[in-house]
Amino acid sequence: LANRLVSNGDYKDFIEDGGYTRPELWMSEGWALRTERHWKAPRYWRQAQFGEQQCDQQPHDQPAWAWEFTLAGRCPLEDHRPVRHLSWFEADAYARWAGARLPTEAEWEMAAQEQGLQLKQSHAELWQWTASPYRPYPGFQPAQGAVGEYNGKFMTCQFVLRGSSQLTPEGHARNTYRNFFAPSSRWMAAGLRL
């Protein structure tokens, strides 16, 4: 695995190369959602408005992606910062475009254990999408009652995220912790590592 998360600058290259207009990069369900919901960039990115400074290389009728909304409010989009607020479909399309794939949950955990602190941004930055559907670990037995019912409802149509975000409680930020969301979810602090 790469020793860093995919950056805003990396993701801009994907957009500028037509990443949101090339159906061959997308899973069919993701392409349908992208089309229906008019996705053109990560969830909270915004283009420069008329009168704001724009990138010189950007055609005048297509303002550059210049801002993102964060917990600190509207902030300039910084190329070196990790890209965030991606759906699993967007993360997967980016990986295909880059000639790579999302890591499996097991690959992510093994890399985190083996590389330790060299695996930069593994915790307290962003949850990281994996290629693994959310399933129980081998030998898992659901608890009786409401807890078992709760777990069973979520073990379908979800993908695993590993790592932790700046919003994760400290006790949850460990290599073995799993998070999960539907592949269409874009609101949470999720990015990717290839």
Language-model regions: role of each:
Residues 1-106, 113-115, 181-193:
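Extended beta-strand/loop cores of jelly-roll/beta-sandwich
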Residues 8-9, 16-41, 122-193:
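Surface-exposed recognition segments
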Residues 89, 109-110, 127, 159:
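Feature representing long, continuous alpha-helical segments
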Residues 111-114, 135:
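Active-site-proximal flexible loops/turns
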Residues 113-123:
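Cytochrome P450 C-terminal beta-domain/meander region
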